Amino acid sequence: MAAAAASPSPATPPRILLAGDANGRLHQLFKRVTSVNQSTGPFHALLCVGQFFSPDAGDGDGGGGGEVADYLEGRAAVPIPTYFTGDYGPAAPRLLAKAASSARGFSPGGIQICPNLFWLRGSARFTLHGLSVVYLSGRKGPGGPGCYSQDDVDALRALAEEPGIVDLFLTNEWPAGVVNGVDTSNAPSQISDPHGYDPVVAELVAEIKPRYHIAGSKGVFYAREPYVSDSAAHVTRFIGLANVGNKEKQKFIHAISPTPASTMSSVDIHARPPNTTLSPYISPAKSVPVEETPKRPAEDADLQYWRYDVKKQRHGEAGGNRLCFKFTSSGSCPRGSKCNYRHDEEAREHYNRNVCFDFLNKGKCEKGPECRFAHSLSDEGAVRDTKPRSERRRVESSCWFCLSSPDVESHLVISIGEGYYCALAKGPLVPNHVLVIPVEHCSSTLKMPVEAEAELGRYKDALAKYFEKQGKIAIYFEWVSQQSRHANLQAVPVPLSKASSVKKIFHLAAQRLGFEFSVVNPDGDANRARELLRSECDSKSSLFYVELPEGSVLLHLVDSNEKFPAQFGREVLAGLLSMADRADWRNCKVSKEEEIQMVDDFKQGFREFDPAE
């Protein structure tokens, strides 16, 4: 019997082997693992993704039953601790039946089916030699053995909201869209085959944001360029593995030695390789439901629900008679009849007439008089600024952009007018990245008084002349959310040679997120476009817009239940400029001394154009 691999010392990162679809060829797989372990080891674990059991129905020699049975019955030994997720194949239910029946309780770290061999069943998160590992076993399908369920998916969605970085995410199938945004001209031709891709996996990885995503089922080896997800400090690396013993000699075993994120420094976690791209995935807000599947046996299903219902109960959200926010706010819910919450058309009608959702759901609202929505059915339609004057002053005193606030970084200011001022962006995407900011505390430049538009126009004209001397043109964009505090219109200078590509790249980015921009004033009059934008803006709407070089505007009105990335504009322009490593402003911060020097340099060049001079 093979001994378990020794644990690494606390100062040494664990060494992990990854393998693709074994397809029942365990002798060949473990022979290769033994060879690698002897020559370049020791390795502490083997993680197998893709189909572990043979696709053949026979139990004889070469069949999945024959080789697996050798290990289950002790005729052969598994060389190092091995974990698999691909619990499907004709013989799999019979071979796993004993382990399934003897399993007691929930085993996130796997069910042992023989010494050193562990079945990762369902979905869960566990720790392996300090690494946080999340997995989804089975594959997309009509239900039953070997197919993951909606319960498994929901459990992972709940886990995604918990703190901590996931080091490894294991799935059997590739995430749909993983090759978006990269050059695939030198990649294996099989990646263009739709077989083996799964949109549900794409949603999950976009929410979980692991450091490594490992998958099988495509029959090829492919290591994608690292990418950075919205709001994630780290990059994600996708590795697809080939089948064991494939004729094309594609790589089916791969070694990694990642330091657990829990022990890494902030600098190391934020490190971005030069070939980092933006995330290839659509927004997880556009939920793709799992196909209708028969429920697991009651005991197993209860275990699955326990994993995410504990979180709901902890926060007082255990379904029952509570309203479904997604249905109440949008009129639809991807879980349909399987949703744990109430779908009430009458409540939706009240919500659409501005009755507070918490009032409808709980009979009270913790915000009390500060809430801007109605707290009785007879007061429908009320949307009001209920904050007392003292409260508004308190908000403004803690605002980053109010000039009277002690928190404002005044050393970044480059010009102050009557209604607007300009400042260099903190953590700029590119040099001379400017913010045009209302002097008064206002949540959007579109809500400023009409007379302030003239001054805004003068600032934009001045910036245009300043950037023109550098061979650049400014791209303006603004994100306006219901939670916005103080508006800032961002002006990012891009080379004139890139100007014609701005419209296309924003349309492509929108398509990736699952929405389409509407074009405001396609005739190209920038002033008229701003007028039309102001008519679209109301106090209840979240929106994003970008002003194109030719004068038209791309506008997206954001649904209340839509997860729109706050850094969308910056991320898209980072992609246009091949600066994905600078998409997050926190990666671009410099010292205060450097900021002061940048402001001085900007002022010297801008002085001749500054409308406030």
Curated annotation (Swiss-Prot):
<dbReference type="Pfam" id="PF04676">
    <property type="entry name" value="CwfJ_C_2"/>
</dbReference>
<feature type="region of interest" description="Disordered">
    <location>
        <begin position="275"/>
        <end position="296"/>
    </location>
</feature>
<keyword id="KW-0238">DNA-binding</keyword>
<dbReference type="InterPro" id="IPR006768">
    <property type="entry name" value="Cwf19-like_C_dom-1"/>
</dbReference>
<dbReference type="GO" id="GO:0000398">
    <property type="term" value="P:mRNA splicing, via spliceosome"/>
</dbReference>
<keyword id="KW-0479">Metal-binding</keyword>
<dbReference type="GO" id="GO:0008270">
    <property type="term" value="F:zinc ion binding"/>
</dbReference>
<dbReference type="InterPro" id="IPR040194">
    <property type="entry name" value="Cwf19-like"/>
</dbReference>
<protein>
    <recommendedName>
        <fullName>Zinc finger CCCH domain-containing protein 59</fullName>
    </recommendedName>
</protein>
<keyword id="KW-0863">Zinc-finger</keyword>
<feature type="zinc finger region" description="C3H1-type 2">
    <location>
        <begin position="350"/>
        <end position="378"/>
    </location>
</feature>
<keyword id="KW-0862">Zinc</keyword>
<dbReference type="InterPro" id="IPR036265">
    <property type="entry name" value="HIT-like_sf"/>
</dbReference>
<dbReference type="InterPro" id="IPR006767">
    <property type="entry name" value="Cwf19-like_C_dom-2"/>
</dbReference>
<dbReference type="Pfam" id="PF04677">
    <property type="entry name" value="CwfJ_C_1"/>
</dbReference>
<feature type="zinc finger region" description="C3H1-type 1">
    <location>
        <begin position="318"/>
        <end position="346"/>
    </location>
</feature>
<dbReference type="GO" id="GO:0003677">
    <property type="term" value="F:DNA binding"/>
</dbReference>
<keyword id="KW-0677">Repeat</keyword>
<dbReference type="InterPro" id="IPR036855">
    <property type="entry name" value="Znf_CCCH_sf"/>
</dbReference>
<dbReference type="GO" id="GO:0061632">
    <property type="term" value="F:RNA lariat debranching enzyme activator activity"/>
</dbReference>
<dbReference type="GO" id="GO:0071014">
    <property type="term" value="C:post-mRNA release spliceosomal complex"/>
</dbReference>
<dbReference type="InterPro" id="IPR000571">
    <property type="entry name" value="Znf_CCCH"/>
</dbReference>
